[in-house]
Amino acid sequence: LSIAALALGAKHAIGLDVEQQAVTSSLNNISEAGFENQATILWGSIPHPQLNQKKFEVIGANISANVLIELAGPLLSCLQDDGVIVSSGVLETRLCDVTEAFRAAGGEVQSTRQIEDWTASTIIRVNGLV
């Protein structure tokens, strides 16, 4: 996701993963793609101590429905007021659960696309909430 963001014009990307092997692979891939000076890859999840309550314009989250549900509040808390979360990798059978978790945390699903059983959604913060 960091490479895609940088290739699409982001000035800097920060990636998080809970698996150390994924962090190592991401660092190698970013180096091979020539973006090593534009990306930071960290081991862990949000909230993360190295992020110091940083707010993001765009958050990409290609993680399971269970993790999205658990992190709905923290993800929205990391989002700028006019920012957007792009979630992907959610099975259609779990989409309502994810949508409800974000709604309960102060978010709103703006759009959803589906290919076969998989969905991707854009989510914003509802002003005054979170």
Show the residue positions of the predicted features.
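Conserved SAM/SAH cofactor-binding pocket of Class I
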Residues: L1-S45, K55
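Residue-level signal for inorganic ion chemistry
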Residues: S26, S64, F102
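A short acidic, Gly/Pro-enriched loop at the edge of an enzyme's catalytic core
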Residues: P47-I59
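A short SAM/SAH-binding and catalytic strip from SAM-dependent methyltransferases
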Residues: E57-E70, G89
